[in-house]
Amino acid sequence: MIDSSKKQQQQPPQHYSFADILSAGDLDPLKEKEWLDPGSQKSLKEVLQLRLQQRRTREQLVDQGIMPPLKSPAAFHEQIKSLERARTENFLKHKIRSRPNRSELVRMHILEETLAEPSLQATQLKLKRARLADDLNEKIAQRPGPLELVEKNILPVDLSVKEAITVSQTNLPENLDTLSFDEDSSDALSPEQPASQESQGSAASPGEMKTSDSSSPVSNTTIQCQTVSSPLPDFFKPVPTADLTTRSPLSCIVSKPGPALIKQTQPKHTEKPRSKKSKDPKPRVKKLKYHQYIPPDQKGEKIEEEMDSNYARLLQQQQLVLQLQILSQQHSTLTTSRKSYPAPLKSQKKQNTINTTICNGNAGAPPAQCSVNRQNSVPCKKTGPLPSSLDDMKVAELKMELKLRGLPVSGTKMDLIERLKPFQDFSSNGVSPSSANTVNITNPACNTTDDATTAFSTSALINSSSPTPSVSIGNNQTMLDGINSPLPMSPTPSEQSNFSSEDTNITDTFAEILTMMSPSQFMNTSPLKVNEDSMGATPGNTPNVELDAVEKDRKLQEKEKQIEELKRKLEQEQKLVEVLKKQLELEKRGQQQQPCSNVLLKMEPKHFNLQIKEETEAPDCQNSKQPVGSGGQILGQATAATISQNIIANNAVVIKHEVPLAKPEHQNVIQQFYVTSQRPPQTAVVAQPQALLATQTAQLLLPLSIKAANGVQLSMVQAQPHTVNPAPAQLSTAAATTTTLLSAPPKQSAPPTQDKFTPHLLNQNQQIRKLCPSATSGNVFSYPQNPVTAVPQSFSASISTSAQPQRSTQLTAVQNGPTSLHEKSSTPPQLQQFIVQQHPLFSSPTTKSKDPPRYEEAIKQARNNPASQPEVSNAHSQQMDDLFDILIKSGEMSPLIKEPSPISKMRPVTANVTTMPVNTVVSRPPPQIHMAPPLSLESTNSLSVSLESQLEAFLDGTLPSGNNIPHLESNSDDRETFSLIDDLNNDLLQNTAMLEHESTPMETTDTPFTANSCLSLDLADANLDNMEWLDLTMPNSSSSLTPLSSTLPSMFSTDFLDSNDLHLHWE
């Protein structure tokens, strides 16, 4: 194996031509060697390719010690192999040295003490084995039968069975030597063997009935029928009713069914072809008797050998014992289940007898001749009701009761009481342990209208509530009598000596029917034909099947109640959602001065759980009012696809609707939805007043307006090296600013109600907005940019705090800012920058920690995938929105006045990287690739103030006094806002201890801003309790930005010299 593998490795992978494989002297090899035809050449190539495919990998060879591992040198591997060989050699040498000599082996009786030659010893050993085999065969042939074992008290049976055996021994035929048998060597435990030979025995013999144990040794089967040798396809021939009524009852106590193998016998006579099976020329496979060998050329011949009297007597005794067991089981079944018989069986006597005669006569045997041979009767012992207390009974009485019920009598008194307790319970409740019922089936093979009664006795579980059914085939009536047995019911009927070769089809049908019947079909009257005083029936008793049905009905009712409760809860939740929707619409209508289209929420109970929390106005903004507009949101087909990929379970989404405040002069609005995924394994959002926080699983989206002479329209593209979603999303927008961000509802540990909803559609009918191409797929929220006129709440009051751990999934991508593509305006577009952060949790699992692509490559990827959706995960940008709303409200920032112009193409805007520390941001995103439109497009409005200089001055604490800043109208809470801004400036500029990243102080670089520059805010990745630094990148348009991977441990090296230090050093 090792050599072959080495040869396989040495084989070159390329295929040589056959001219190269053959010797160089053959100039025309294919003509001279005719065996190298094209077919053989192809087969050799296939063989070579198969060998190359099947050779073991290097890992397997390393595991098997054939090749050295990659991590260790080859010399070390060879040294290890040599050491192992030396150790094995030493071990073998030691064993050889320490082995005992021949005298020691003779003394230990391992070797025989003889001086004979080895060949002679082998001959003697063969002779000894042959002699032992002969002795064994003789003992097997003369082994005692079950009757002899019972007589010698070797087999434990009941007294009644012993009496029946002694009585029935007088009827044994004396001319058994003239009979010949053909026996299967596979014993009676294989019910698959078809009884392909019609065997007919003498009518005067009660023991020639061939029965067998089916797959369970307890479920024995008797068939009451009289067969007539006829080529008709009828399985059963009619049995006159007079025969059943004139037979003397033979009743005996049930014997314990033993698991011993009982050989299966068949008297063999002339074989008549009655079906296709018997006409099949194939010989029977299992025809060997014991160790008899039949050569293959003689297997098709019919070999009839006479058996000795010992073997015939053995088989006859087996038949007789099996019959007695079957009769005893039937009797015990009828005595224990007499209370389940219906009212037409009028007699209630305790003495129960039953016709259990088995008759298998040949063609000319009349019914009277069959019934004459069954005159042997044993007086039946009655099984009365058990007393209330079994403990007071003596052991002998307990054993007698057990014998009457066919149960084992061995064991202690407590064991006996435990065996009798089910009968005591059933007798007190009036319910029998098993019941014999009848079900009718149709046999398509029957052509006659006569009735033949077939009684199959099958086993049922003690204390089982499922009854044993009895079936009838066509007009042939079949009774199944349930017997008490600790084994499960195995309803496969045994083969009978009067079955034809087609009868096994019927037995299979019985087995299927018994396993497929429902308990409701079992409640039929029994068709047993008995004498008038043979059975006692107590009307009004409840059989076990009713108990089972009641239990099933109760379980079904409980399940229906649970379903009704769930439906009721779902309806309540849907009603609550409708009420909240109506309240939201009423608030919009009451506060709205400019008409907007309504918000459509399409509810589906399969995707999310919705909770909308209404919050009142902030205390510092109580005097101001704001009209509420609608933000354009759409989650289309591609969004649903990404939801199905990213969301494993139903996510509970909490939507907290805050009523924001604005000045009454402005018509626009900020709608804020707090979307929270109720997945608990992540850390909670812990926000502080005057702190700018974002969770690890959030994105911070910051819309900034920048005044520029040649303003450009920037849109965000997140380019990552993994899969893209090429489906374009066109989002309808309206004249409103909608900010969707991921946060935790304050002081809320679990949602009180959860309503399921699907991604909802907020239809607006003004503009069509097309998202920029992105390298990752996700759900998209797009927002139109309109003038932001007032801050909704104060900065400290608007921060959400929660102690609940939140886990954000890639639920929706949030995009702030103008992204419309198909509009024409007259003025240059506003420069809009998106600051996006994303945690590695949102990145695709295929993303690996490697150096990101260059900026130019990322732009090429973005251009090559123009139809893919931008994925921006749910943003926790409440704090940033509040910060810039405060700046706008205080007049230090100019609001975005109008919707910028659409663009038909996106072009990249390069950026510089610089770092500005802010001590309150705790998470870092992957970098975003920004694409800008051509600078020649017009916009409806130009901004009057550059946002970069504003933000730089604000962060440096040198905000201008408003000379170049158009202030908005301020209201009564301007003083609070200004004090809040001062506090924020102090926090941003004073805490230098929190500005260190990995124990390295950071320097704040003041970078001049140009007209075409863009602002990018990157947040460091850390835990919630570690306040790290905030990176502000102020790039020039002529430089390039290298994107960052979301899985890197940190973003930059900590010391940058200037703003042109673009090629970052990765840690």
UniProtKB/Swiss-Prot annotation:
Q: Which intervals carry biased composition (Polar residues)?
A: 193-203, 212-223, 799-819
Molecular-function GO term, any one: transcription coactivator activity
One GO biological process this protein is involved in is: positive regulation of transcription by RNA polymerase II
What InterPro entries does this protein map onto? Myocardin-like, RPEL_repeat, SAP_dom, SAP_dom_sf
Q: Where is the composition biased (Basic and acidic residues)?
A: 268-283
Q: Where is this region: Disordered?
A: 175-223, 249-286, 799-829
Q: Which Pfam families match?
A: RPEL, SAP
Report which residue ranges the record marks as coiled coil: 540-594
Its localization reads: Nucleus
Question: Positions of the RPEL repeats?
Answer: 46-71, 90-115, 134-159
- Cellular component GO terms, alphabetically? nucleus
- Mostly located where? nucleus
Ranges where the SAP domain occurs: 390-424
> Mind listing the UniProt keywords for this protein, alphabetically?
Coiled coil, Nucleus, Repeat, Transcription, Transcription regulation
**Which comment does the entry carry about domains?**
The N-terminal region is required for nuclear localization and the C-terminal region mediates transcriptional activity.
Assembly and partners are described as: Interacts with SRF.
This chain's function reads: Poor transcriptional factor which uses the canonical single or multiple CArG boxes DNA sequence. Acts as a cofactor of serum response factor (SRF) with the potential to modulate SRF target genes.
Protein's recorded name: Myocardin-related transcription factor B
- Provide the species name: Xenopus laevis (African clawed frog)
Highest classification ranks of the organism: Eukaryota, Metazoa, Chordata, Craniata, Vertebrata
Gene behind this protein = mrtfb
